């Protein structure tokens, strides 16, 4: 992507993805930004242009989440949406709920406006006693902000948060590279 500026932010201790995002506030400024976790691997980023464009069709959108239908939701934040065109409208999110109310897993790429920082500052610690982005998005929804959802469909991606998952992603990449 042309004119793309990437900033890396490290945490001294695990205080949550929301805390890491809050630490980036001074770099973001007043423009929308793409947020990508460090523990997810997408072998094909061809969806990204459409994902970015989808967040720009309505100036009232505060954020766009990426979701995928999943049978097993353990370890995922979930979204509940209302069907709309061109994107679904989010009306509820929850971070790793014990009893999910939908099968829409939130994937770890977001497009957000700086309003998220105010929401993070108003959000209490959540799952694992950490500040969570999903909880801040819930705060935005409570404040009547508009959040949309982009369906990732059946595209492949890997959670690489553990050694075993990272190995599977490397193995998959190796197979692609040696075809």
Over which residues does each language-model region extend?
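Conserved beta-loop-beta/alpha segment of the NTase-like Rossmann-fold superfamily
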Residues: 1-76, 121-122
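Residue-level signal for inorganic ion chemistry
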Residues: 24, 39, 79, 113, ...
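Catalytic-core segments of class I nucleotidyltransferases/pyrophosphorylases
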Residues: 52, 56, 84-178
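Short, conserved, surface-exposed binding loops centered on an aromatic residue
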Residues: 68-71, 80-84, 100
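Short, acidic/polar N-cap/turn motifs at the starts of alpha helices
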Residues: 76-78, 147
